[in-house]
């Protein structure tokens, strides 16, 4: 079964996120558990935690259907020790918030070397950052998102994702989220079913589908291989509809959150309905 949704707002309280997801016909959702533009947030109160859990139950969202995202400020591969510690503390806080909310996944961008340390050293720092957080939490999987490779961001090659996973001690609590826009911008073609087969065969060989814990379904304004991260609505960008139809009709993408981060929230309900229809087309065939 496909879990399809979008990154919804938690404005006014975390308990509002499941309702907003249900309103657009989603069977999955992503959210920030705190203001993603701030390093620290007030601790979660028992009331906030209970309200969120009740709302998830009311709208039939299990932890497997929810893909929280951490703050964009965090850089788990930061070359400067003080800044690295600040990021590690913030990431641990994000993991602990997920644990308190009964969530089992935390999606994050791996990190950037800022042109100050070698790529290999940065990847090792990211893996060690994950190890530190996993050692102090239970039940939450760290889900590494592939990047477009913009600037000095790492995680744009499958080999880099595999290198991070290799450095994580508890392999049962590390995973990957593949963003289609990022992959396309990084040079992984998705424009045809044949291209999708080739790209995901490479993913399976280098990273492994056992680590795929979520996806971001985004078309791309940016050109193929441009290393520029610019999302677009499904079918409106340079990837086109075929990739998303192909994903909907492949059972390897069942049972994980498939999250829209496309640029027009007003049509998320339409995009979700279209994605669901592609899945139905497969069943009928």
Curated annotation (Swiss-Prot):
Source organism: Salmonella paratyphi A (strain AKU_12601)
PROSITE patterns linked: AP_NUCLEASE_F2_1 (PS00729), AP_NUCLEASE_F2_2 (PS00730), AP_NUCLEASE_F2_3 (PS00731), AP_NUCLEASE_F2_4 (PS51432)
Protein name, as recorded: Probable endonuclease 4
GO biological process, one term: base-excision repair
Keywords linked to the UniProt accession: DNA damage, DNA repair, Endonuclease, Hydrolase, Metal-binding, Nuclease, Zinc
UniProt xrefs under SMART domains: AP2Ec
Gene: nfo
Pfam families membership: AP_endonuc_2
UniProt binding sites for Zn(2+) 2: 145, 179, 216, 261
Family: Belongs to the AP endonuclease 2 family.
Gene3D superfamilies, A to Z: Divalent-metal-dependent TIM barrel enzymes
Cofactor binding remark: Binds 3 Zn(2+) ions.
Molecular functions per Gene Ontology: deoxyribonuclease IV (phage-T4-induced) activity; DNA binding; DNA-(apurinic or apyrimidinic site) endonuclease activity; phosphoric diester hydrolase activity; zinc ion binding
Catalytic activity entry: Endonucleolytic cleavage to 5'-phosphooligonucleotide end-products
Residues reported to bind Zn(2+) 1: 69, 109, 145
Protein purpose: Endonuclease IV plays a role in DNA repair. It cleaves phosphodiester bonds at apurinic or apyrimidinic (AP) sites, generating a 3'-hydroxyl group and a 5'-terminal sugar phosphate.
Alphabetized InterPro entries for the sequence: AP_endonuc_2, AP_endonuc_F2_Zn_BS, Xyl_isomerase-like_sf, Xyl_isomerase-like_TIM-brl
Top enzyme category: hydrolase
